[in-house]
């Protein structure tokens, strides 16, 4: 790991994010999956730059059974009328309810890495 990456990691105070970034980078190199390196880079940025995506935007831009990865938080504004699988750093309570009511799944980033190590078929959503 380069010196610049270590400096970025030492600025992070959340131990879950630090370990997640390290795991993402290991997976990117080990599984030859550049999607995990991209997500690690986005999570190294300041948290004010993390994605905050509403359910209404997810509903407009996805089809049934899509798999999304959101490097940030999913918010509950809007309605979801089809099932989607969403992996995100965090979910608001209302977003979690709306996704599960529509028949979708809410996963953590760690869970999606285990389920799909190559990252194929995953859309990064911002």
UniProtKB/Swiss-Prot annotation:
Gene Ontology BP, a term: translation
Gene3D superfamilies hit by this protein: 3.100.10.10
Gene Ontology terms, MF aspect: RNA binding; structural constituent of ribosome
Organism domain of life: Archaea
Protein name in the entry: Large ribosomal subunit protein eL18
Entry's Gene Ontology cellular component terms: cytosolic large ribosomal subunit
Organism: Methanosarcina acetivorans (strain ATCC 35395 / DSM 2834 / JCM 12185 / C2A)
PANTHER family linked: 60S RIBOSOMAL PROTEIN L18 (PTHR10934), LARGE RIBOSOMAL SUBUNIT PROTEIN EL18 (PTHR10934:SF2)
């Amino acid at each position: 790991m380069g010196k610049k990456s270590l400096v970025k990691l030492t600025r992070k105070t959340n131990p879950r994010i630090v370990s997640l970034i390290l795991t993402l980078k290991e997976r990117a190199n080990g599984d030859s999956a550049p999607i995990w390196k991209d997500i690690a880079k986005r999570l190294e940025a300041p948290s004010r730059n993390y994605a905050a995506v509403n359910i209404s935007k997810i509903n407009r831009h996805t089809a049934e059974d899509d798999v999304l990865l959101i490097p940030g938080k999913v918010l509950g504004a809007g309605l979801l009328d089809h099932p989607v699988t969403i992996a995100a750093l965090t979910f608001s309570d209302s977003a979690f309810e709306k996704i599960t009511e529509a028949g979708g799944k809410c996963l953590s980033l760690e869970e999606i890495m285990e389920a799909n190590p190559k990252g194929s078929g995953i859309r990064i959503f911002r």
